[in-house]
Structure formats: structure tokens, C-alpha cells
């Protein structure tokens, strides 16, 4: 069956959905930009969106989602950060599309457009075709509206986001299916990475492997990673040992925080 859910589900909750027969979920991910998620009042962080995708795929649940743009206050930096991040997510299910924000009646954007830098310009494009009488005020009956914002985004960044999302979809329909998997031995972890068109094998040992394993199941703070190291070595870890391992994994695109 199909259900709509929030994207802040835990691994255990997603496993329960799978065991209960859920085949498709729509978690309303819509962005990997923290500022855009805050603007939407989603109550989630980009990392929670990533984890929802990860565990849904792990438990065999299809996930339907889209990337939304066109929010008031969005910046070029928001687009650049999101583009850079989604290039690291090619092993996860791609979005159905990149679409623009839909402005609806009764929403905060409709009720207080000036507060958000929005100017409502017309009713939705379909209304004049459906209600063609000249006596009907489409602005009074419409539920969705055309609008512009004071935000100016670099058109090349928009195009790059569209192209990156399209490449993501094409990769999942090709013979070169992207993947990111790992195997765990006693003293090391081997990561097999084909998110790009190049296959890469990365061997992680010591602190790098410990940090990788520590963060695999759920998000961890630096303090929690240090505690994990302490259990491994039986004493307080050296200064910056955890931080250096985290930095290495982030550089390789294996850790996000």
C-alpha cells in the first residue's frame, strides 16, 4: 500500500512500515537546503531526509519525492549547497522532478505575501480556460496563483540543479546503476563507490573505520563518536582524533553533517 509520511522517520519505524506491507511512501522531502526546509517549516533537517531515503531503500520501500524551488528568500548559496549534496546521493532513489513552489489560497504566502516578498500576479493558468465567462473574477475563485518573488537566483544554477536531477534519474535507468556499499572486516572497512561514473574502492582503517561504522545506523555527535573511540581503545582518544577522521570521511563524501 501507499502512504504519505514525514521524512523524520527512524530506521525502526521504516522497518515496521515495511513489515506491515508498505510498498510506496511519499515523505515530502522537497529539499536538502536547511534554509529552504526552515522556510517551509518542515521541522526536519537535510540529514533526516537522507536517512529516510537510505532506510526506505534498504527495506525495499519505493519512495516518491520531488525537489521544490522558488521559495522566498532562497539564495544562490542554497542552490550550490544542494547541488553539491545531491551529487553525493546518486546511490539513493532520485526525485520524480524539480518543480516550483505552488502558492495556494489560505497559505501564509497567500495571506501575508508582502511579509515574504511575494507579489501575486494572476490566478492559476487553468482558470480562464475552465471559467471563460467575462463576469467571473478568477482571483476570487482561484485556489492556486501565479506569483513572483524579490529573490533573484542565477539562471545557470537553476539549470545546473535541473540537469543534476535529470542525470540522477538517468543513472537509475541505465546499466551503470550507481551504488555505495561497504563490507566490514575485523580491522578495516572497504567502501565500494560508484556514485559517479568511475568505480572507486576505499579502504578505511582505525579511526576512519570506527567513525564510519559509528555513524552508519543513526546520526552521531562528535562527542558520541569520541565515546565510541574510547570504547575501542580503552582510554581517552588523542586530541582531534575523531575530528580528523570525520574530516577525512567528509572529504570523501562518505559522511554528511
What are these regions (language model features)?
Residues 1-64, 69-77, 88-100, 106-109:
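Conserved SAM/AdoMet-binding glycine-rich loop
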Residues 8, 73, 152-155, 198, ...:
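Generic amphipathic alpha-helical segments used as scaffolds and interaction surfaces in large
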Residues 32-39, 64-70, 194-198, 208-209, ...:
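Glycine- and acidic
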Residues 44-46, 84, 253-254:
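Short alpha-helix boundary/capping motifs
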Residues 48, 78-81, 224, 241:
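An acidic, carboxylate-rich microenvironment
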Residues 77-204:
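C-terminal accessory regions of radical SAM enzymes
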Residues 202-257:
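Long, charge-rich, low-complexity alpha-helical segments
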Amino acid at each position: 500500500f501507499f502512504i504519505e509520511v514525514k521524512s523524520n522517520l527512524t530506521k525502526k519505524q521504516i522497518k515496521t512500515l515495511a513489515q506491515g506491507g508498505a510498498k510506496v511512501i511519499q515523505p515530502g522531502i522537497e529539499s536538502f537546503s536547511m534554509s529552504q526546509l526552515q522556510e517551509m517549516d518542515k521541522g526536519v533537517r537535510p540529514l533526516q531526509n537522507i536517512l529516510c531515503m537510505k532506510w526506505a531503500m534498504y527495506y525495499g520501500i519505493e519512495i516518491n519525492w520531488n525537489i521544490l524551488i522558488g521559495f522566498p528568500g532562497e539564495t544562490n548559496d542554497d542552490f550550490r549547497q544542494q547541488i553539491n549534496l545531491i551529487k553525493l546521493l546518486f546511490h539513493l532513489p532520485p526525485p520524480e522532478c524539480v518543480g516550483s513552489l505552488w502558492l495556494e489560497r489560505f497559505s501564509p504566502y497567500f495571506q501575508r505575501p508582502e511579509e515574504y516578498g511575494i507579489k501575486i500576479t494572476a490566478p492559476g493558468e487553468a482558470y480562464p480556460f475552465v471559467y471563460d465567462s467575462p463576469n467571473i473574477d478568477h482571483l476570487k475563485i482561484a485556489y492556486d496563483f501565479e506569483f513572483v518573488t524579490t529573490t533573484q537566483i542565477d539562471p545557470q544554477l537553476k539549470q545546473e540543479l535541473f540537469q543534476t536531477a535529470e542525470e540522477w534519474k538517468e543513472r537509475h535507468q541505465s546499466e551503470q546503476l550507481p551504488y555505495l556499499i561497504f563490507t566490514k572486516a575485523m580491522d578495516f572497512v572497504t567502501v565500494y563507490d560508484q556514485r559517479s561514473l568511475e568505480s572507486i574502492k576505499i579502504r578505511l582503517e582505525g579511526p576512519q573505520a570506527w567513525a564510519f561504522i559509528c555513524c552508519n545506523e543513526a546520526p552521531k555527535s562528535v562527542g558520541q563518536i569520541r565515546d565510541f573511540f574510547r570504547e575501542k581503545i580503552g582510554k581517552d582518544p588523542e586530541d582531534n582524533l575523531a575530528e580528523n577522521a570525520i574530516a577525512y570521511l567528509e572529504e570523501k563524501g562518505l559522511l554528511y553533517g
